[in-house]
Swiss-Prot record:
Ranges annotated as biased composition (Basic and acidic residues): 1-21, 33-49
Name used for this protein in its record: Histone H2B.2
Pfam families hit by this protein: Histone
Record family assignment: Belongs to the histone H2B family.
Annotated localization: Nucleus; Chromosome
Primary gene name: H2B.2
Leader sequence residues: none
Taxonomy of the source species: Eukaryota, Viridiplantae, Streptophyta, Embryophyta, Tracheophyta
Length: 150
C-alpha cells in the first residue's frame, strides 16, 4: 500500500505544477504547442480528413525475393538473415545505379536519346573488373536472347 500512496502525490505534483505554470504558459508558445497534439479534438479532425480518402501505402521495391530465389537455386539448404538480405539489396541497388549512370553517360557521349543493350554491355565492361565483367556480359547476353526468343 505504501508504494501506491507515494505514487498518488507524485502524480498530483505535476498536475499542481501545470496549474501553477498555466498563467505564465499562456505567453510561452512551446508549452501551448506541446498541449495541442495531446488533445483528442484535433486528432479527430485529422481523422475526418482521412476517412474520405485512405492514405495510400508507399510501395518499396526491393530485390529480396529475387535474391532469395537465386540463393535457393545455388544453395537450397541455406537461409539468409534479414540483415544480410538488406546488405545484398543495397549492394544490388548500388551496382544498378553505377551501371545506369555509366550507360547514361555513354548515350550522352554518342548523342543518342536511348539506352540500349549495347550501352548496358559497355557500362558493365567499364564498371565491373576483369573476369567478373566477362561473366556478367555472357549471362546478360544469354538472358536477352532467352527473352527475345520467348
Amino acid at each position: 500500500m505504501a508504494p501506491k500512496a507515494e505514487k498518488k502525490p507524485a502524480e498530483k505534483k505535476p498536475a499542481e505544477e501545470k496549474a501553477g505554470e498555466k498563467a505564465p504558459a499562456a505567453g510561452k508558445k512551446p508549452k501551448a504547442e506541446k498541449r495541442l497534439p495531446a488533445s483528442k479534438g484535433e486528432k479527430g479532425g485529422e481523422g475526418k480528413k482521412e476517412r474520405g480518402r485512405k492514405k495510400a501505402k508507399k510501395s518499396v521495391e526491393t530485390y529480396k525475393i529475387y535474391i532469395f530465389k537465386v540463393l535457393k537455386q545455388v544453395h537450397p539448404d541455406i537461409g539468409i538473415s534479414s540483415k544480410a538480405m538488406s546488405i545484398m539489396n543495397s549492394f544490388i541497388n548500388d551496382i544498378f545505379e553505377k551501371l545506369a549512370g555509366e550507360a547514361a553517360k555513354l548515350a550522352r557521349y554518342n548523342k543518342k536519346p536511348t539506352i540500349t543493350s549495347r550501352e548496358i554491355q559497355t557500362s558493365v565492361r567499364l564498371v565491373l573488373p576483369g573476369e567478373l565483367a566477362k561473366h556478367a556480359v555472357s549471362e546478360g547476353t544469354k538472358a536477352v536472347t532467352k527473352f527475345t526468343s520467348s
